[in-house]
């Protein structure tokens, strides 16, 4: 059963993906070819399997409906097709997703809301941290988190010390015509 935990504009959904579906995804990921990008130590898996795509699409739709309900807005739906496998030693420095003014993966003009779906928890390190809010999140497999991309929600990911950290990241654009996103 899904369970939501909210703190300001940060929401964690536990059990977004069932343990059975996580096991199916992990089996597929373990046997899939890894892709790389220049100057990036992480590996990427483009999900080609119909059953796995169905699992990820269902999770994405659940995320979308929860985001729209919580923020009272309509958001872009980019879909999911890429899993990121993080390398030991990887970390993500303190940053804000909206500052970059980069389009979303789906081509929407900006990143108002960020989301992460966690497909593993058999790792040490790799915690999502919001230092200014004193929030530290140790993810669990099957959970998801979403939060506004504004300066108030600057965050980082601690160095991955061991294990396998698998995620699907998404960026959502507010399509309702408002400049800022906030939960009333």
Regions found by a protein language model. Give the residues of each.
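Fe(II)/2-oxoglutarate oxygenase catalytic core
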Residues: 1-144, 152-184
């Amino acid at each position: 059963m899904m369970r939501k935990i909210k703190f300001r504009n940060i929401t964690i959904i536990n059990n977004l993906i069932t343990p059975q579906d996580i096991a199916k995804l992990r089996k597929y990921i373990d046997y899939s070819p890894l892709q790389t990008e220049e100057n990036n130590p992480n590996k990427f898996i483009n999900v080609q399997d119909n059953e796995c795509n169905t699992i990820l699409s269902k999770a994405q739709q659940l995320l979308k409906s929860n985001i729209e309900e919580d923020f009272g807005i309509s958001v872009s739906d980019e879909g999911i097709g890429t899993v990121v496998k993080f390398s030991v030693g990887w970390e993500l420095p303190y940053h804000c997703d909206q500052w970059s003014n980069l389009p979303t993966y789906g081509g929407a003009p900006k990143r108002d809301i960020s989301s992460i779906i966690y497909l593993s928890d058999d790792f040490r390190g790799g915690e999502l941290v919001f230092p200014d809010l004193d929030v530290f999140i140790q993810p669990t497999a099957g959970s998801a988190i979403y939060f506004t991309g504004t300066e108030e929600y600057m965050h980082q990911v601690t160095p991955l010390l061991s294990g396998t950290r698998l995620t699907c990241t998404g960026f959502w654009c507010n399509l309702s015509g408002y400049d800022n996103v906030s939960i009333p």
